[in-house]
Amino acid sequence: MTIDNHRILQPSAANIRAAASALMDGRLVAVPTETVYGLAGDATNERAVAAIFTAKDRPRFNPLIAHFRNLADVAAAARVEARAERLAQEFWPGPLTLVLQRRDPCAIALLASAGLDTIAVRIPAHPVAQALLEAFGRPLAAPSANRSGRLSPTTAAHVAAEFGEEVAMILDGGRCPVGIESTILDLSGERATLLRPGAIAEERLTAAIGPIAQVSADARARAPGMLASHYAPDLPLRLDATGAAADEVLIAFGARVPLGAGLTLNLSPAGDPTEAAANLFAMLREADASGLARIARSEERRVGKECRL
């Protein structure tokens, strides 16, 4: 695949201003966050939000995450109660998304919430995302900058490989330091419910607010990441491999690596789950581009309690 690099720009002050201007015009901009790159549009503009769904080929029933500068901006759009305040104090800015009750009225486009009475909100920690939010002055709807069902992008080049003229520019903040999606926690009801495992382990959330329920398998999507096909590689994936063939890409972890693969990619030779999580999407993309027939994943590992590698 030929990658169009002319839209990849360094996040200088001038380019941040240009990105904010493009967003004001209803265009889309790719922006780095600490988790993955986001496909950002004006969260208050229904047409811009619709353009995100179209560019990603995303089902309209799958809500988007709205990104904010600070807690005061979040509170203007959503009802921030005691549990949310505790989590915000501990984990924001950072890779935690909270699903809260929308305020009425709410400036965020209803399409971003997929017509629900809730809204998914986050304050990103990445300095480029923060700078763009500050320059733009409004919340950004910013799901991962990939076509729906494909691997999430952790570099600007990954975004350029996915999108053409749908994106006005790609702000290059380097490789995303976390490399996996934010954890999503639903606080819109009486019980806190984990909707999507992610960068912040469930144990840390439980320590902050008490017991957390698990989402039921048949629940309607209240936030991104609840579709079975989410973030899948193109190649067939063989799990818990104890060996690998010459036509396979081996995704390994730790010092003990089976031999025989056509290509071996080690998530973390040192066995560090944090390093492995940061490398996961990039290495799956490399595996997809290898020209080999399958991916073999060695013995299952976890990041925290719930994020499997």
Description of each model-found segment:
Residues M1-K305:
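Active-site-adjacent structural elements in enzyme catalytic cores
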Residues R308-L309:
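Extended, polar beta-sheet/loop recognition surfaces of beta-rich domains
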